[in-house]
Amino acid sequence: MESTERVRSHFERDAQRFDAIYEEEKKSAFARFVDRYVRGVVVERLHLVRALAPVKGAWSVLDMGCGPGRFSVDLAKRGAARVLGVDISKEMLDLAKRAAAAQNVAERCEFVLSSFRDLQVKETFDMSLGIGYFDYLENPIEDLQKMAQFTKGHVLASFPKRYEWRVPSRKLRFMLTGGFVRFYSKAEILRLFASIGVPADRLYLIDLGRDYVAVARIV
């Protein structure tokens, strides 16, 4: 099975549990402990994107691998005039659409079932997100290049660290469930952006413990 199909299958099965990571009040004390210390970066990334989002104007967002729409809906609530969320999991997109409707931002959010490589758009975005997206790509450079082409502003993308204490358990979990996951060194991330024409002076990395988040200015 190709990696895209393995990832799709994994998140179709795991959509409800993944979305629940963001719901502190609905979990047992043990589940809160596990999510905070093992998967806490998921929520930390949301806080970081909030802090880096534009605050003025009619700005737009492309959210690649949008999952249950937590980032898309949150940014629409914070003023984004146009949000395009893209994912390969119908189950995830169903959650995203329900969340947008529940928060009264459905008219500003569009959710598309597609792989990024098959996506066709004729617009550019002020902010493009690849949060929890590059974890699951065997050949990330094509997707990163396309994301930059769709952006006139900033790309924010997370990359799980290659050398981090949670790597062995995460590798094992995906291996046992038939999924695919990859990890990155800081040098590899810098090379990826350099290969698509983003020099070091337009890129910085934020260390979130388990992940690096790259913030690249696209001109």
Task: Describe these PLM feature segments.
Residues 1-53, 58-65:
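Conserved class I S-adenosyl-L-methionine
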Residues 62, 70-116:
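Class I SAM-dependent methyltransferase SAM/SAH-binding core
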Residues 127-138:
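A short SAM/SAH-binding and catalytic strip from SAM-dependent methyltransferases
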Residues 141-153:
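A short glycine-rich, Lys/Arg-flanked "PGG" loop and its adjoining helix->strand segment in the class I
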Residues 152-160:
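Conserved beta-strand signature within the Rossmann-like core of class I S-adenosyl-L-methionine
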Residues 162-180:
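Short, glycine-/aromatic-enriched active-site segment of Class I SAM-dependent methyltransferases
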Residues 180-197:
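Short alpha-helix
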